UniProtKB/Swiss-Prot annotation:
Pfam families xrefs: FGF (PF00167)
Name of the protein: Fibroblast growth factor 8
Statement: the UniProt record of this protein carries the keyword Glycoprotein: yes
Subunit structure, as described in the record: Monomer. Homodimer. Interacts with FGFR1, FGFR2, FGFR3 and FGFR4. Affinity between fibroblast growth factors (FGFs) and their receptors is increased by heparan sulfate glycosaminoglycans that function as coreceptors.
Alphabetically ordered keywords of this record: Developmental protein, Differentiation, Glycoprotein, Growth factor, Mitogen, Secreted
Subcellular location: Secreted
Length: 82
């Protein structure tokens, strides 16, 4: 497992993400295009990266908010968001 560092630097090649659908509906997995690692959540609510994204800790449910933004709620730890 690797730590995730989000520095918000424009043009950073590690900022490109690939969103994969998990099932019919609004469940997705997110992985880094450069690394191939999946964004997951640990039991403390911290974002971590894993090479295998098959666990529920790596699945997120898309929730559309009133302001038209999309929130990603972790499938394993409901109430925790990315």
């Amino acid at each position: 497992n690797k730590r995730i560092n989000a520095m918000a630097e424009d043009g950073d090649p590690f900022a490109k993400l690939i969103v994969e659908t998990d099932t019919f509906g609004s469940r997705v997995r997110v992985r880094g295009a450069e690394t191939g690692l999946y964004i997951c959540m640990n039991k403390k609510g911290k974002l971590i990266a894993k090479s295998n994204g098959k666990g529920k800790d790596c699945v997120f449910t898309e929730i559309e908010l009133e302001n038209n933004y999309t929130a990603l709620q972790n499938a394993k730890y409901e109430g925790w968001y990315m």
